[in-house]
A protein has these predicted regions:
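Conserved strand-to-loop "acid loop" that flanks and positions the catalytic carboxylate
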Residues: 213-219, 225-226, 231, 283-287
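Active-site nucleophile loop of the alpha/beta-hydrolase fold
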Residues: 88, 191-199, 216-220
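The conserved beta1-alpha1 loop
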Residues: 52-56, 194, 215-216, 285
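C-terminal motif of bacterial Sec signal peptides marking the signal peptidase cleavage site
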Residues: 13-14
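C-terminal catalytic histidine-bearing segment of alpha/beta-hydrolase fold enzymes
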Residues: 210-214, 236, 244-308
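Serine-hydrolase catalytic machinery in alpha/beta-hydrolase-like enzymes
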Residues: 29-40, 48-165, 178, 182
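Sec-dependent signal peptide recognition
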Residues: 1-8
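Primarily recognizes the serine-hydrolase "nucleophile elbow" in alpha/beta-hydrolase
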Residues: 153-209
């Protein structure tokens, strides 16, 4: 087969849907087949919203979507959104599967403030695609931003997409923020769930972009306030990232909101920013390293600053 035809075939290859709404797809990126899933709502219309969901460390598309009240596809169906679920590169070590995303921090291991981990940090297996990894490196070294860009382009070619929202949990949140910084021409908003980037490496887009960032006080895995995590890694405090974004985009107004039921939440919303974007920080006073709970309510909490 002609090589150009083969590459085109691999780029557009799509498996039969697992059910009436989910499709498994493959794209050739960096000479590797990368997998993503597409959720198609019941009523396809014009000017659709595409939501790209990014799983956390060791996760996959299914662990992001979840089931029951936490089922992300239910949220997409209600709002008539198309969903895309890319999967990070994975490998096996010590009998366990590891998957991760390259947010241009966890793969590097060292930033402007020095090493991103303590001397006695927990050890994570080095991804095989990393050559001579730094001692603090733990995430894939692949071009995940380019991969997600291809996933976005794929859906724009298939559907009438008006806006793109990228949402990620933990390591997926780190990548969501990195995508917001690198792909501002293709993304309209990001939602970072407990994905504080490495200390000194929290990026800011060159163009205004709407962001929602969520952290939980009892989260010791990727803490939103304390710099040092339980595993010995250093993370940029959430308030620093929020301040840098709202200052960069000249947000002139803000409002605060306290929620006590069903969860204790402190929310600060910055608006009247350049380009009409908004910046929202959500601090959960009781949660740990998890989505805001109860889950169905929590998904709406995260999207409300963008959709309302």
């Amino acid at each position: 087969m002609n090589r150009s035809i083969l590459l085109l075939t691999l780029f557009l290859f799509s498996c039969s849907p697992n059910d009436n709404s989910m499709q498994e797809n493959s794209i050739l990126h960096d000479e590797k087949l990368r997998t993503f899933y597409t959720y198609v709502p019941s009523n396809i219309d014009k000017e659709m919203t595409l939501v790209v969901g990014l799983h956390g460390y060791t996760g996959n598309a299914k662990t992001f979507i979840r089931k029951g009240d936490a089922d992300f596809n239910n949220f997409l169906e209600i709002n008539n959104f198309i969903g895309a679920y890319p999967e990070g590169k994975s490998f096996y070590a010590n009998g366990r599967r590891f998957s991760s995303w390259n947010d241009l921090a966890g793969s590097i291991g060292q930033g402007p403030k020095g090493d991103i981990c303590d001397i006695d940090r927990d050890h994570y297996p080095y991804p095989p695609d990393c050559v001579n990894p730094h001692r603090c490196s733990w995430a894939s070294c692949g071009d995940d931003i380019g991969f997600v860009e291809k996933v976005i382009d794929y859906h724009k070619n298939q559907y009438d997409i008006k806006s793109v929202i990228v949402i990620g949990m933990s390591n997926g949140g780190m990548l969501a923020q990195a995508i917001g910084c690198k792909l501002t021409d293709k993304v309209d908003a990001i939602i970072n769930i407990e994905g504080m980037q490495a200390l000194g490496m929290s990026c800011i887009p060159k163009k205004p972009l709407t962001m929602v960032i969520y952290g939980a006080k009892n989260d010791t895995t990727v803490p939103p306030e304390d710099i040092l995590a339980a595993d010995g890694y250093f993370y940029e405090p959430m308030k620093n990232t929020v301040n840098e974004w709202k200052n960069a985009f000249n947000c002139s107004n803000s409002s605060k909101k306290q929620i006590s039921n069903p969860a204790e939440i402190s929310e600060e919303h910055f608006y009247n920013c350049d380009g009409g974007v908004t910046i929202t920080s959500i601090l959960d006073h009781n949660n740990d390293h998890d989505w805001p709970k109860p889950y169905k309510w929590g998904i709406n909490l995260l999207f409300a600053p963008i959709l309302n």
